[in-house]
Amino acid sequence: MARYTGASCRQCRREGMKLFLKGDRCYTDKCAIVKRNYAPGQHGQGRKKVSNYGLQLREKQKVKRIYGVLETQFRNLYERAENMPGKAGENLLSLLERRLDNVVYRMGLASSRKEARQLVTHGHFTLNGNKVDIPSLIVKVGDVIEVKEKSRSSAKFKNLVEVNSRIAPKWLEANVEGMTAKVVGVPTREDIDLEIAEHLIIELYSK
């Protein structure tokens, strides 16, 4: 499955909620959900009754869109979550939260997860002192993520530090001005401030 390259706002309208795909714009009245809170397309305003399978599928698509994950990656994370102690749904969300691109976003050094993914891919970060360019990498407790020394003086990062107002979750010890963060815990369900019914995803994959 190829990565979606269309308008981000259409995805939010399809899911009927803000997915925060466009950074700061999502917090303003310019957000498409504020203007047109119905699905895109000719028949978007007449939402049909959805079957249980449809609900499960929509929930999976929603979470994939929030985190910018493709189907193969998502399936692999689900299988990993199933083999971990505890509830599979909560494990899945915890793994998604610990993706490196999401950690950069949670640090406040990117306006969206999409931008965070691009910054990681372009090699602007180090992990435990080593250059890293894999957005899907899952960080662990004790890992230290930093903006690469050569990138710190760029206008891009200076501006991100100046405008940042995001509060890092408690599992992440972030120093935005220092452009660094340390993973001090594992994300729990209470740490994830997203409207997600993860049990529907588990039900879908369990069939």
Curated annotation (Swiss-Prot):
Gene Ontology biological-process annotations = ribosomal small subunit biogenesis; translation
Under the GO molecular function aspect, what terms does this record hold?
rRNA binding; structural constituent of ribosome
Q: Name one Pfam family in it.
A: S4
Q: What is the superkingdom listed in this entry's lineage?
A: Bacteria
Per UniProt, the keywords (alphabetical) are: Ribonucleoprotein, Ribosomal protein, RNA-binding, rRNA-binding
Using the record's annotation, list all stretches that form the S4 RNA-binding domain.
Answer: 98-164
Cellular component terms per the entry's GO annotation: small ribosomal subunit
- UniProt key word Nucleotide-binding: no
Among InterPro entries, the record links this protein to: Ribosomal_uS4 (IPR022801), Ribosomal_uS4_bac-type (IPR005709), Ribosomal_uS4_CS (IPR018079), Ribosomal_uS4_N (IPR001912), S4_RNA-bd (IPR002942), S4_RNA-bd_sf (IPR036986)
SMART domains for the chain: Ribosomal_S4, S4
- NCBIfam families reported in the protein's UniProt record: PRK05327.1 (NF003717), rpsD_bact (TIGR01017)
On assembly, the entry states: Part of the 30S ribosomal subunit. Contacts protein S5. The interaction surface between S4 and S5 is involved in control of translational fidelity.
Q: Which family does it belong to?
A: Belongs to the universal ribosomal protein uS4 family.
* Reported function: One of the primary rRNA binding proteins, it binds directly to 16S rRNA where it nucleates assembly of the body of the 30S subunit.
Protein name as it appears in the record: Small ribosomal subunit protein uS4
Q: What organism, scientifically named, is this protein from?
A: Clostridioides difficile (strain 630)
